[in-house]
């Protein structure tokens, strides 16, 4: 026993095995004030994280990244900020042409840091992500941090609601999956594509989407698989695909050393993020099934028990090529489950992006993160930050096509155009229509 305690205290075991931390079930949080969130969406200050060689001409490409290590608290994680770093590096490497993004992490030294991932900031920036979206726009959302659950009240299809856990959750509370659906999915118009990645515990149904692949560790063993309907409602005009680190009852591992995933970065990270980014970089023309076969196989080989999940607003044909652009290719055998009004045509085909060429990783390894606040208190530095804290906007340049960004709202003097960064400065390692129907709780 003494020997075992010595090993645990030295941290050797944590470096060898996945570390899973949790916050336990939480008190049911307050509902999000959606109208207020969308009124404040224009206060967000997006940036351009890098320049892709081939710009996307079909619309805007907006992205939101949230990584929370909860540094200095009893629920501290070690790899969530690195997950954001890894995801940004992967998207850059595959030349995903982000036109504007916001980065919420609890490390102010992170390049292009936008704001701390407090409850207020996460909600406001999620509203920014979907505010004023139009057909052809492409959205990407990545969250790495704690996930938890709370007793469901009005949901007849599950006993517990899933929640995201902001930095200040102990004071301000978590964010319900009901509100995540209302914020991110419900009001998307036809022709908008969203891909979301949740690397956290209890994450399979965080957006409460109607279709899911509910699988187990035998998925890679062969046979044909398909999605199934898991909810009677919650349809959307937009096309939404969600990759989750585990099922609703499962935990998502925080890995102390991710070099075994082949990323080259000796640091911490979420197992699901590491496996998914590896699959995206090391395969081309892969299908949804390919991603899951490879991701689950990687995690299984490394000794992880978590099983990544897939959910969507429409039944995905798992054997069609995966893309971050364009409409979901619907499994025709399941299309009758989707109400006709949610199957509007998309219009012209989306442009094809060739597989990326091999590149060297750009983003420097992270520096050791120091606690910014005592474990027993709220983040003290947040109290001194203005609600609009982040990267100030700069005037537009000739490199930003006219009309690519929405018109400035009152008080926004720079046209809502993200700042332009030199190609060697920001590189990375490996709405009124929307509010229609608001006020109808699930």
Curated annotation (Swiss-Prot):
Full protein name: Metacaspase-5
Binding site for Ca(2+): 161, 177-178, 208
Encoding gene, per UniProt annotation: MCA5
Region Disordered, annotated ranges: 348-442
Glycosylation sites recorded in the entry for this protein: 69, 112, 234, 257, 282, 331
Bias-annotated ranges (Pro residues): 348-371
GO MF: cysteine-type endopeptidase activity; metal ion binding
Subcellular compartments: Recycling endosome
UniProt biased composition (Polar residues): 422-434
Top-level taxon: Eukaryota
Effect of residue 201 to A: Loss of catalytic activity
Enzymatic class: hydrolase
Signal peptide range: 1-18
Enzyme Commission (EC) number: 3.4.22.-
Stretch list, region Negatively regulates catalytic activity: 336-442
Keywords, comma-separated and alphabetical: Calcium, Endosome, Glycoprotein, Hydrolase, Metal-binding, Protease, Signal, Thiol protease
